[in-house]
Curated annotation (Swiss-Prot):
GTP binds at residues 34-41, 113-117, 168-171. The gene is cysN. Residues 34-41 are annotated as: G1. SUPFAM superfamilies: EF-Tu/eEF-1alpha/eIF2-gamma C-terminal domain, P-loop containing nucleoside triphosphate hydrolases, Translation proteins. This is Sulfate adenylyltransferase subunit 1. It comes from Escherichia fergusonii (strain ATCC 35469 / DSM 13698 / CCUG 18766 / IAM 14443 / JCM 21226 / LMG 7866 / NBRC 102419 / NCTC 12128 / CDC 0568-73). Residues 25-239 form the tr-type G domain. Its EC number is 2.7.7.4. With CysD forms the ATP sulfurylase (ATPS) that catalyzes the adenylation of sulfate producing adenosine 5'-phosphosulfate (APS) and diphosphate, the first enzymatic step in sulfur assimilation pathway. APS synthesis involves the formation of a high-energy phosphoric-sulfuric acid anhydride bond driven by GTP hydrolysis by CysN coupled to ATP hydrolysis by CysD. NCBIfam families: CysN (TIGR02034), PRK05124.1 (NF003478), small_GTP (TIGR00231). Residues 168-171 are annotated as: G4. Heterodimer composed of CysD, the smaller subunit, and CysN.
Amino acid sequence: MNTVLAQQIANEGGVEAWMIAQQHKSLLRFLTCGSVDDGKSTLIGRLLHDTRQIYEDQLSSLHNDSKRHGTQGEKLDLALLVDGLQAEREQGITIDVAYRYFSTEKRKFIIADTPGHEQYTRNMATGASTCDLAILLIDARKGVLDQTRRHSFISTLLGIKHLIVAINKMDLVDYSEETFTRIREDYLTFAEQLPGNLDIRFVPLSALEGDNVASQSESMLWYSGPTLLEVLETVEIQRVVDAQPMRFPVQYVNRPNLDFRGYAGTLASGRVQVGQRVKVLPSGVESNVARIVTFDGDREEAFAGEAITLVLTDEIDISRGDLLLAADEVLPAVQSASVAVVWMAEQPLSPGQSYDIKIAGKKTRARVDGIRYQVDINNLTQREVENLSLNGIGLVDLTFDEPLVLDRYQQNPVTGGLIFIDRLSNVTVGAGMVHEPVSQATAAASEFSAFELELNALVRRHFPHWGARDLLGDK
């Protein structure tokens, strides 16, 4: 057993007391990102090593792996603690998103180690979508690079407000304060154009040597700020979803027997209480919450992020993809929206194309009406383009096949975030963040043939009980 873990359990008075104490610690989700070979995996390995989160058998295996795959000579290659795929070890790079878990006396952590190569930007965006904080690594020898800017912009686009700029490999520039200051000023100049009110902090460190990671560096006495671990333990994270109105997307209708009918899902934002009056969208039907069922039994109330099953007092028609919210709240369904897109496919995103989209458990289809602009990563300016290529980031206008209930992504990532799915291959080809729902929109007649429009009108006239929508959007 890990000796530090054993000591913590002893200090708490046993395993049960230790587990209770762990449950009450705050949780911080963060990712490491940046350009290729900036030391992201090594930094995570150093954090795990210096906080004594590595078991003896893992340490022994690391010694052996360092001899076979290591890139640090006689030293331990701490990156191998994270880079688990064979291709990653052979190439000395990170490909997949690797998750690691550790805790200190003050906090619990979930780390997402994301790849730095441009071709794996999609993996980086996936890792960032669930994080509260980003550690952006910069090689002290290279300074701010294009991938540094791209990862910074994607992180802020995905709602991350806390950035730690870790200027790594300071040992290779003789721990130069001048180098640190220059890179800091360069990044701050770039960051002025990033959206939102950001909390940006700078830490000079050496992940390989351990300087300023978990303990103060004796080689950088000119730096009087906190270590990286101290920043992680003390940064105050305010989750947007806690203060937002209630949103409960239905993931699954749970009906194990004739006497029980519940609606399972994760509460996306706000809180819900037994007896609360709720409304189902898009139908608009109202009911009261009779029970809140969890794995640990019934609860009187639940909060954002908790997986629950709601039982209502009335037997009403609710299916996967429907949204429950407070009965007194008005949230109109929309059939169009402007969406910030991170494109992840070789085939460019072009106007006129249609994709399956998935948002908060609901799957439907959307058409690309136009591309307003693409963001130039170098200076964050907007430029007109005909299509959005691989790893491109831009603002796109979408029209949906059916009315959807949406929030802006910055208000609610669950009901404002979507993915694009290729209809033939079923591969995820893009990530979207709702910028602004458009209250009224109509489909373009040119999308449908004359036969399709006539057939649609015929079905709606003679078979209204089928509920077919008007392809032209005339309600």
